[in-house]
């Protein structure tokens, strides 16, 4: 009672008409419902807690809490004791049991069906059924609260430009200690923009990606009209062109597909792919080209296996196979690298067949915001001994043609990416993109960083110094925000102290992993009815999925089968080259890259 009275008094002191739920009084995922104008009630149903604010654990919950290790303890165990994990990885039933626990414990943190969106902070049919919205992990802060974060902090948030300049902008490039490379950085950017497709004409809370998951619309197009323009309608294949004996995407002129290119780009360099923004940087077009080649390769395999099949069945089955390949690569290569675990992750949909699991997904606005990993980007891009700055690199597909995919893969495999957590590692070229992320979070009325930590079962920070793990940035944040409980979600993710020798801090992993794994395993192809050889054209197609890796994808589609992975293998290869490239421009010297990045690709 005392705690409740104090929270209400604080709200009333700041605003006589404050919504009683502004103080976020309901804990442990309890739901706050206003009762009259100055009272509230917490719905603790199925939370495992009871009491006025859902703070008293039930008996079984109390036991679970006593036995459950902290996220950092779990991370330590999984990233140490390599010898033990090598043994576990070889014992199938143990590996399966642990992987099943990883999948269920993470994915159960995501509400399914979805619950809220920017306009509905309560359960509603509109929030459930309207696919044009991103869903929300936490409801928006009520409109009638005394401060932007509810009752904590100042009445106005700090200037977003100041936040970016003081704690986010790079002073000096900080390489990722996990050895993450640019093959990873561009894979992340390419992969996620099949479902991060904000409809900025309607606002940051809306999406054009109505499938809300891994549908490969960045390869095939979001609409049927776009897909048809990109298809060859022969043997299931996508349109392509041959340049120097190698397959590349067709041009905008040949397909009449809408793409975003500045007027300075020559027609023959305006490649057309599923995602309209992928002309932005050659790294994205590299992956677009690789997946185009893979689709057409799989079509050839299926055509040989099923000469009786027509174009449509070859196309549709190849698409399902590529979805399977993507999910396997993301879990076993991409997430495996990010985790730093010695435990070997496994893509096996059958692990969940006897579990309570819903094969549907809805992309959350917070997941989109969380995935703004711009500190990965280097200051320059090093390709085959040449150096390209941002102005030379963006909207310049001639770089891809000049060097070819083999050199791109080799060079990006060797070049180290930046560390995401720890602050002050954001490239100046994307300063405006980062500012826009903060502004859009405010427009969508995100709750505070600490509220999101509680949402994902992580203890809230008690001070800025605990958040950053140092004193200088902590003091800057203290001056900007005044209260750790008023710290914003997005900048906090980037300034949070990294885990030891890791790319991310605790919250990025604990909040990001549930969204990621639920989205991957919630795909229809992972369901019992779909996950069988016949869905993928028989054992041949099923094998393509079950043997997929980032290395096999490259070997099947890039001349010479260059070695690749998502981390730099030899630290001696990360040294900076000093040769300055002046060739391969496309008349873009007079274009400000930061303006283009802001106007055309706020999400990228």
Curated annotation (Swiss-Prot):
Pathway: Lipid metabolism; prostaglandin biosynthesis. The record marks 516 as: Aspirin-acetylated serine. Heme b binds at residue 374. GO terms for biological process: cellular response to interleukin-1; cyclooxygenase pathway; meiotic spindle organization; ovarian cumulus expansion; positive regulation of embryonic development; positive regulation of meiotic cell cycle process involved in oocyte maturation; positive regulation of oocyte maturation; positive regulation of protein phosphorylation. CDD domains: EGF_CA, prostaglandin_endoperoxide_synthase. It is an enzyme of class 1 (oxidoreductase). The modification S-nitrosocysteine is found at residue 526. One of its GO terms (molecular function) is metal ion binding. S-nitrosylation by NOS2 (iNOS) activates enzyme activity. S-nitrosylation may take place on different Cys residues in addition to Cys-526. Acetylated at Ser-565 by SPHK1. During neuroinflammation, acetylation by SPHK1 promotes neuronal secretion of specialized preresolving mediators (SPMs), especially 15-R-lipoxin A4, which results in an increase of phagocytic microglia. The active site is at 193 (proton acceptor), 371 (for cyclooxygenase activity). It is a peripheral membrane protein. Substrate binds at residues 106, 341. GO terms for cellular component: cytoplasm; endoplasmic reticulum membrane; neuron projection; nuclear inner membrane; nuclear outer membrane. Disulfide bonds join 21-32, 22-145, 26-42, 44-54, 555-561. Keywords: Acetylation, Dioxygenase, Disulfide bond, Endoplasmic reticulum, Fatty acid biosynthesis, Fatty acid metabolism, Glycoprotein, Heme, Iron, Lipid biosynthesis, Lipid metabolism, Membrane, Metal-binding, Microsome, Nucleus, Oxidoreductase, Peroxidase, Prostaglandin biosynthesis, Prostaglandin metabolism, S-nitrosylation, Signal. Pfam families: An_peroxidase (PF03098). Belongs to the prostaglandin G/H synthase family. The conversion of arachidonate to prostaglandin H2 is a 2 step reaction: a cyclooxygenase (COX) reaction which converts arachidonate to prostaglandin G2 (PGG2) and a peroxidase reaction in which PGG2 is reduced to prostaglandin H2 (PGH2). The cyclooxygenase reaction occurs in a hydrophobic channel in the core of the enzyme. The peroxidase reaction occurs at a heme-containing active site located near the protein surface. The nonsteroidal anti-inflammatory drugs (NSAIDs) binding site corresponds to the cyclooxygenase active site. Conversion of arachidonate to prostaglandin H2 is mediated by 2 different isozymes: the constitutive PTGS1 and the inducible PTGS2. PTGS1 is expressed constitutively and generally produces prostanoids acutely in response to hormonal stimuli to fine-tune physiological processes requiring instantaneous, continuous regulation (e.g. hemostasis). PTGS2 is inducible and typically produces prostanoids that mediate responses to physiological stresses such as infection and inflammation. This is Prostaglandin G/H synthase 2. The lineage of its organism: Eukaryota, Metazoa, Chordata, Craniata, Vertebrata. The gene is PTGS2.
